[in-house]
Curated annotation (Swiss-Prot):
InterPro entries documented for this protein: DNA_methylase_N6_adenine_CS, HemK-like, N5-glutamine_MTase, PrmC_N, RF_methyltr_PrmC, SAM-dependent_MTases_sf, Small_mtfrase_dom, tRNA_(Gua-N-7)_MeTrfase_Trmb
Keywords, ordered alphabetically: Methyltransferase, S-adenosyl-L-methionine, Transferase, tRNA processing
Record-level Gene Ontology MF annotations: nucleic acid binding; protein-(glutamine-N5) methyltransferase activity; protein-glutamine N-methyltransferase activity; tRNA (guanine(46)-N7)-methyltransferase activity
Positions of the UniProt region annotated as RF MTase: 1-302
Root EC class: transferase
Start and end residues of each stretch annotated as HemK: 1-300
S-adenosyl-L-methionine in keyword set: yes
Protein name in the entry: Bifunctional methyltransferase
Length: 518
């Protein structure tokens, strides 16, 4: 028996509609187009055209698969992504339109379009042809749609793509042939970074599995029953992949390299925190067409470039290991600081860190921020923190002025400046931590009634600082009759002990910020 295109489509539409398919008419036409190999326009115009028995039989078989909720992309074996068709099957995740935002972001970065307020596909790529070569790593390539789209859009790029699934790699390789990019891509069977040796990349990109197992009951039948779970679900409430990437990515990035990741629409805060904890900057979060957070742009804090690596004695292997592995977890950033609810104390120039780490140990409910340019002292703090399980601190191994803009006004409960370099010679005095301009800045960072503690074993310097404080007029000196009395929980540091041995007397000035408003 023969049926017309109209009859077949109407029948299919009714069946698909009954099981809740969102666009039954469109899907029916897609299936029929796949069977007849005729354009959609033909099926719309020639509604009375009769179909052959072979075409009807083939269509019914495909329709039965769709009525079992098998995704239409798996039935046809094709899915469009970034205006190109990609081969797909049950071994790879079906490309989603939301992931196209990731492509937009990478293109924008590569062509120096860093201010992507809205993501839109680039139609003219003449400017791309003149850019520098970019070496890109994609983790978990699946069908290869991300890597191949980037290669097609950006002629001066090459890609190494990894995947743990051998079957997925077969699909990706088929797509590289389909889109003629085999000479610019290497696909490696690897679990994340395992088989990458010591290669370095300008960009690391990934759409990793990020769905929590607890969300399975909420997912569409098409997804949960047919798409590969290894590409969908992750442990740690869907965040496992981000932890793996954060832990390992730095060693594979070139200087100034970046990481571009797709994220779940409600995961931005948690993913940001993971990367902040590992010593990265969050450069930008991009939204999809539904205004959901979808793609995150990340760059590592590069200690060799961004931080003053001053070293007193040569660093031991243990110290270097602490700086490499532990310091990123405790690096100060304004993002970490923004949501802080605890009392906050800042110590400027903490030396070897004895006072700093002791204060943190005694006051576990207070956050201590330490500024110190000498990495020997930074490493010493990290060592003692690990030994005593102290975690209520952040470190800024750089010059003080570089952190001040990121400290909000009225945010600090106290500031310690203990035994700073006195810079005795007049022409060097402008280098002192406490000068007129910097004192004005620091007082604004203090809460009203917050404390500033200053100590020195150089008598002239101490009394010159008292004069500076009195000229400022916004501090009250506590215990001005007894400058020998230190503040609470003070311990004698190695430097202080050295001063005692050399017959120099340490004096302490405890100040209370007395300004009634900023």
């Amino acid at each position: 028996m023969q049926y017309s295109i109209k009859q077949i489509l109407n029948n299919a539409n009714d069946k698909l509609n009954k099981i809740g398919i969102n666009l039954p008419e469109l899907e029916a036409r897609i299936l029929l187009q796949h069977v007849t190999n005729k354009p959609i326009e033909h099926l719309l115009i020639k509604l009375n055209e009769q179909l052959s028995e072979a075409e009807i039989e083939a269509f019914e078989k495909l329709l039965e698969r769709r009525l079992e909720h098998e995704p239409i992309a798996y039935i046809t074996g094709i899915k469009e992504f970034y205006s190109r068709e990609f081969i797909v099957n049950k071994h790879v995740l079906i490309p989603r339109i939301d992931t196209e935002i990731l492509i937009d972001v990478v293109i924008g970065l590569v062509v120096s379009r860093n201010d992507l307020n809205t993501c839109s596909k680039l139609k003219s790529l003449d400017s791309v042809k003149t850019i520098q070569h970019y070496n890109i790593l994609e983790l978990g390539t699946g069908s290869g749609c991300i890597a191949i789209s980037l290669l097609c859009e950006l002629p001066n790029t090459s890609v190494i793509a990894t995947d743990i699934s051998v079957d997925a790699i077969k699909v990706a390789k088929s797509n590289t042939i389909k889109h003629n990019v085999t000479d610019r891509i290497q696909i490696i069977h690897s679990n994340w970074f395992e088989k990458l040796n010591k290669q370095k990349f300008d960009l690391i990109v990934s759409n990793p599995p990020y769905i929590s197992h607890s969300e399975k009951l909420e997912m569409a039948i098409e997804t949960i029953n047919y798409e590969p779970h290894i590409a969908l679900f992750a442990e740690e409430d869907g965040l496992e992949a981000y932890s793996i990437i954060a832990k390992n990515a730095k060693q594979f990035l070139k200087p100034n390299g970046k990481i571009i990741l797709e994220i779940g629409f409600s995961q931005a805060e948690k993913v940001c925190q993971i990367f902040l904890n590992y010593g990265y900057n969050i450069d930008h979060i991009y939204q999809d067409l539904q205004s959901h957070n979808r793609v995150i742009e990340i760059s590592p804090i590069n200690l060799n470039r961004s931080y003053a690596r001053r070293i007193g004695k040569s660093l031991s292997k243990m110290q270097q290991k602490l700086l490499d592995n532990e310091l990123p977890k405790y690096l100060f950033s304004k993002e970490k600081f923004a949501s802080e609810k605890r009392k906050i104390f800042l110590e400027i120039g903490f030396g070897m860190g004895e006072h700093f780490i002791n204060q943190a140990k005694i006051n576990p409910d207070t956050l201590f921020i330490g500024v110190e340019v000498y990495l020997n002292g930074v490493a010493n703090v990290l060592k003692h923190a690990a030994q005593h399980n102290i975690m209520n601190f952040l470190l800024f191994p750089n010059n003080l002025d570089l952190i001040l803009n990121d400290l909000p006004n009225n945010s600090l409960d106290g500031i310690y400046i203990l035994f700073p370099d006195p810079w005795i010679k007049n022409k060097k005095k402008k280098k002192r931590i406490l000068n007129k301009e910097r004192l004005n800045i620091l007082q604004n960072k203090l809460k009203n009634n917050g404390n500033l503690v200053f100590a020195s074993d150089i008598e002239n310097y101490f009394y010159e600082t008292i004069t500076l404080i009195r000229q400022n007029g916004n501090f009250e000196i506590i215990h001005n009759d007894d400058y020998l009395k230190p503040h609470d929980n003070y311990i004698i540091t190695k430097y202080h002990q050295k001063a005692i041995n050399e017959n120099r007397t340490a004096k302490f000035m405890i100040l209370q910020h007395a300004l009634t408003g900023h």
